[in-house]
Amino acid sequence: MSYLLISYHIQEMGSEGLSKLSYSEESRDRQLLDLKENLGAKELFHLATCNRVEYLFHTDNLEELLENINTSKQLPLDTARFFSSKESVVQHLLEVALSMDSMIFGENQILGQLKTAYQESLKFKSLGPQTSGLIQEILKHAKKIRSEPKLRNIHTSVATVAAREFTERGSKTDKILFIGAGETNQLAARYLHKYG
């Protein structure tokens, strides 16, 4: 039994490259289950944020999974980061959960996105006991680390940093237009409403 984590980051792929790895909400579950089956993986966890896409596979045969990934051409390999030891997978996912490699160091939205991705993966039954247990441990340890006194009071996200910057530089009469109803825009709007 082995893990394989394939990670794509905006630094290597750019936003256009990452968008090619995104799935519509309507088809995501089916496409991910098809990917899992086509590659011969036992379990699959998928996380997509604005700066990264992560695929965590659990398999009985790592060599076969790698061969299937290589021949299927379903995932680009030239811009991917690979983690195959359990230790490297855990370290990478913990760094992701703690936003150590994000636009804003320590950004608190990523942990919530990881939890949501976990719940969605449970819902469409792509997880099994191995991957589910691993993600639960990552969430538990990340929450524990985030609750440390020095980290607990840091409320950082791209949205709050941008909104804070706007309130410091803009005037009270400046008009703002939000395009899109995504989580980042909603958070920025709440922050500006509260403090602007």
PLM segments and residue spans:
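Generic structural signal for well-ordered alpha-helical scaffold segments
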Residues: 36, 163-167, 189
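Short phosphate-engaging motifs
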Residues: 61-65, 110, 184
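Glycine/serine-rich phosphate-binding loop and adjoining beta1-alpha1 elements at the start
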Residues: 77-172
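Glycine-rich phosphate/diphosphate-binding loop of Rossmann-like nucleotide-binding domains
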Residues: 169-196
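Conserved short-loop catalytic and cofactor-binding motifs
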Residues: 19, 150, 176
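Short glycine-rich loop/turn motifs that provide flexible caps or phosphate-binding loops at active sites
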Residues: 55, 105, 179
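A glycine-rich (often HGG/GG-containing) alpha/beta subdomain
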Residues: 1-102
